Amino acid sequence: MFGIFDKGQKIKGTVVLMPKNVLDFNAITSIGKGGVIDTATGILGQGVSLVGGVIDTATSFLGRNISMQLISATQTDGSGNGKVGKEVYLEKHLPTLPTLGARQDAFSIFFEWDASFGIPGAFYIKNFMTDEFFLVSVKLEDIPNHGTIEFVCNSWVYNFRSYKKNRIFFVNDTYLPSATPAPLLKYRKEELEVLRGDGTGKRKDFDRIYDYDVYNDLGNPDGGDPRPILGGSSIYPYPRRVRTGRERTRTDPNSEKPGEVYVPRDENFGHLKSSDFLTYGIKSLSHDVIPLFKSAIFQLRVTSSEFESFEDVRSLYEGGIKLPTDILSQISPLPALKEIFRTDGENVLQFPPPHVAKVSKSGWMTDEEFAREVIAGVNPNVIRRLQEFPPKSTLDPTLYGDQTSTITKEQLEINMGGVTVEEALSTQRLFILDYQDAFIPYLTRINSLPTAKAYATRTILFLKDDGTLKPLAIELSKPHPDGDNLGPESIVVLPATEGVDSTIWLLAKAHVIVNDSGYHQLVSHWLNTHAVMEPFAIATNRHLSVLHPIYKLLYPHYRDTININGLARQSLINADGIIEKSFLPGKYSIEMSSSVYKNWVFTDQALPADLVKRGLAIEDPSAPHGLRLVIEDYPYAVDGLEIWDAIKTWVHEYVSLYYPTDAAVQQDTELQAWWKEAVEKGHGDLKEKPWWPKMQTTEDLIQSCSIIVWTASALHAAVNFGQYPYGGLILNRPTLARRFIPAEGTPEYDEMVKNPQKAYLRTITPKFETLIDLSVIEILSRHASDEIYLGERETPNWTTDKKALEAFKRFGSKLTGIEGKINARNSDPSLRNRTGPVQLPYTLLHRSSEEGLTFKGIPNSISI
């Protein structure tokens, strides 16, 4: 088939790579897609040459600047390891290769081969240049008795002196450790040792080391702004993050100095992806734009730093904010922010209209929309079925007194249409949104902050005959002024539609949403997706070879997560960062998420388990997915269960290809090391919990991988990409509370009577913090042009296993079918919770999306 190959025969290879300067952020904003030559012309000017090894044309890669050596998967040297072939160099630039991606360049290379070498299974590569490059892929053609071999690389390669061991890449085959070709075993083991490192020293830019550390870099002790160290203690338990090894602060030897955050080099794509424009935008926002906003408000000497009316709020996207010329000129050149901040050429800054206000300007004020967003909004997984009355607390009464709810049956039954509380409990029609226990322990401290005046809230909701929810009562609690241990001071507010009572009701709903906004950002979003996933990403890279089937299954679901989390530590969740500036808990924000993590349960992250735990579903073998939903028209749950089922089916089919028995799971040394470390180190503060899967059965493996995939994809999409569509109207989702409900006889009460809108606006997030909040959530809610969605892969040939590829294709087809079902449900007028008074169809779990602010799309990973 391949003819006769004698000694001296050569194997042709094609190497695809991208030079560093193509991936430079500022350069990308002004170049086309023509690869190195085009880039050199566009950036440097024709004929310009840089010294010191900086790349300016494709010829820089030729000569003896990049070498490669094949490693045999079938023939060994004298030590029993795969034979290493002769060192060869890139030979020819292939500028017109049709399969090239944007800004990629291809080169030919020829390897000497004879029959005694066998089939290649890996290769070494050396970079002799000063600058690194991004190695995309390598393809070997016409291997005798084998055909084509592909290597999917996607990795930065630095100068060879940066590495203690040669950079190695493995063929795109899949092997359990026990099935690895013997000649490759040593190389497989060594590569994992390199990725684990030795746990010492400060990490450098070129490092590829994955290790664990606590969150000891959020504060700035030397600047007088310390924060508790999260992780490593029973007081402040937390998932681990990537170790950086930075210098410690003078004031606190256990805290790291703030500054640039290391992430393993291949986690930081530089600016290879357009998604990096979005992450860079967050950084620009933190460092450049927020100070400019502050300056603008000061310079303009706005009547106050307040909105004066609801129309004033809507002007943010209907008319825009006029900014001083010098302010706008400083924002405009920042490439990452050009799309985020649109201007009309007249020094006006304009936000895009949020979806929640596109059809109806006042729909957000209705009780139906308030209740609908509890099950179809951006935080749809906190509501619980009420199973006892009155609601009780789990807080220690010796510390916080009696936190039992003061809501009475009589108050609820006013709006229950003749149904009693007992009847509603027995027929599963009462629900609660309960933030009492999350906020009460922090409320005394929060309310001592300069502008915070907040409550802990409980909201009771009733399931109506038409399938919608309506709020029956809101309880607003604050700590007793003489001590937390005396219990709360509480008021109960009931629905009202007229007069001052309707304003008080609107303010009570605002206080609920302020609780909900803070909890959503800190727990539902940051903790339950970003933070809990990072340890699994670290453990996967440390213990599962790229040849391992579970690595190939999970790797796409970690894409950019460590990178965005590092950026969050630097600009979002750090001391005096964006989150502390714009959300109620302020400096106690991340500490609050630590207290919630104490009760985090890995197995409850599976959607069916979560729904059952919250009382929103009952196990029923005859029902779809084995669950009967208590609220039948629960958009997040209905769509989510279909996505969960598709994920679990795909994971089951894939895992079954490699693990036919429980024994296969137990005997997989890499898999066992991975799981042990993810639990005992990555989530070390919870390692003794009995609920951790033991990783002894195929079901343990399938369930655990399904939870990881679900959390990284659909769960994150559900709590992230609706942030601007719902929260872009600060009236709908305020983030700060600055006033308690005014008492009768006070000037604030009189203002509330005379000017309800002004009273509302003086209670919620003011103008400066609104600008910060909207700027951030707009970036977070966007999809990049090159987003990779669930059921897709960056590389179609991600494995050579045809059965795995077929199963993956079925997974994609199933997800496409679910999209059609979602669209059909959104068109069904009987399902009122799908669109609500604001006429916003629930599409957050619609798998595919276009670029931008779309209110839909499930990316594979937590990449923003």
From Swiss-Prot:
CDD domains: PLAT_LH2. PROSITE patterns: LIPOXYGENASE_1 (PS00711), LIPOXYGENASE_2 (PS00081), LIPOXYGENASE_3 (PS51393), PLAT (PS50095). The lineage of its organism: Eukaryota, Viridiplantae, Streptophyta, Embryophyta, Tracheophyta. Its cofactor is Fe cation. Belongs to the lipoxygenase family. Keywords: Cytoplasm, Dioxygenase, Fatty acid biosynthesis, Fatty acid metabolism, Iron, Lipid biosynthesis, Lipid metabolism, Metal-binding, Oxidoreductase, Oxylipin biosynthesis. One of its GO terms (molecular function) is linoleate 9S-lipoxygenase activity. The gene is LOX1.4. It comes from Glycine max. It catalyses: (9Z,12Z)-octadecadienoate + O2 = (9S)-hydroperoxy-(10E,12Z)-octadecadienoate. It is found in: Cytoplasm. Fe cation binds at H525, H530, H716, N720, I864. GO terms for biological process: fatty acid biosynthetic process; lipid oxidation; oxylipin biosynthetic process. SUPFAM superfamilies: Lipase/lipooxygenase domain (PLAT/LH2 domain), Lipoxigenase. GO terms for cellular component: cytoplasm. Germinated cotyledons. Plant lipoxygenase may be involved in a number of diverse aspects of plant physiology including growth and development, pest resistance, and senescence or responses to wounding. It catalyzes the hydroperoxidation of lipids containing a cis,cis-1,4-pentadiene structure. Its EC number is 1.13.11.58. Monomer. Residues 44-171 form the PLAT domain. Pathway: Lipid metabolism; oxylipin biosynthesis. Binds 1 Fe cation per subunit. Iron is tightly bound. Residues 244-264 are annotated as: Disordered. The keyword Repressor does not apply. Residues 174-864 form the Lipoxygenase domain. This is Seed linoleate 9S-lipoxygenase. InterPro entries: LipOase, LipOase_C, LipOase_C_sf, LipOase_CS, LipOase_Fe_BS, LipOase_plant, Lipoxy_PLAT/LH2, Lipoxygenase_dom_3.
